[in-house]
UniProtKB/Swiss-Prot annotation:
Family membership noted in the UniProt record: Belongs to the Casparian strip membrane proteins (CASP) family.
Transmembrane domains' residue ranges: 13-33, 45-65, 81-101, 127-147
Quaternary structure, from the entry: Homodimer and heterodimers.
Cytoplasmic side: 1-12, 66-80, 148-152
InterPro entries documented for this protein: CASP_dom, CASPL-5
Cellular component annotations (GO), alphabetically ordered: plasma membrane
Membrane protein topology class: Multi-pass membrane protein
Record keywords, A-Z: Cell membrane, Membrane, Transmembrane, Transmembrane helix
Extracellular side: 34-44, 102-126
Protein name, per record: CASP-like protein 5C1
Keyword Cell membrane: yes
Length: 152
């Protein structure tokens, strides 16, 4: 079995998962802790909160699996498990990218709403972008691991 640099069960993959967890949690917190009463009037903000609410537990769960795999060094690598992880990362990375793009565009349009709120929305969109890129990287590395698992 050929392992790539950040494939499932390696320490670099664990770091990717921790980064996803950190950035998705930060994005969620920046969106939720605001004092703007019109927050729920914008669908894009609610969408980003929903997506980051999905990405955070996904990343935490996989980070725990990665940590267990690194510590025990005996987690069986099955093609179906890695396929589910690749599919989940792929879907969630596109959902978070869409949420980040829509939030960033609405934040730019709402510049007259006040600097404090727009800066918070832009910061949340930036954290969502970073989480999305780490999820794309994780998808790519685990996808490269799949052919070697299929041959066994």
């Amino acid at each position: 079995m050929v392992r790539t640099t950040a494939s499932f069960g390696t320490s670099s993959s664990f770091v990717l998962r921790l980064g996803q967890t950190l950035f998705s949690s930060a994005s969620l917190l920046f969106m939720c802790f605001n004092d703007d009463e019109d927050f729920y009037a914008y669908t894009t903000f609610c969408y980003l909160v929903t997506v980051m609410g999905l990405v955070t537990p996904w990343s935490v769960t996989l980070a725990l699996m990665e940590a267990y795999s690194i510590l025990v060094k005996k987690l069986p690598m099955q093609a179906t498990v890695i396929s589910v992880i690749v599919a989940g990362d792929f879907v969630l990375s596109f959902l978070s990218l869409g949420g980040a793009c829509s939030t960033a565009s609405v934040a730019v349009l709402l510049m007259d709403a006040g600097e404090k709120q727009c800066d918070r929305y832009k910061l949340s969109a930036t954290m969502a972008f970073l989480s999305s890129f780490l999820s794309f990287a994780s998808t790519f590395f685990n996808f490269c691991l799949l052919p070697s698992l299929m041959s066994h």
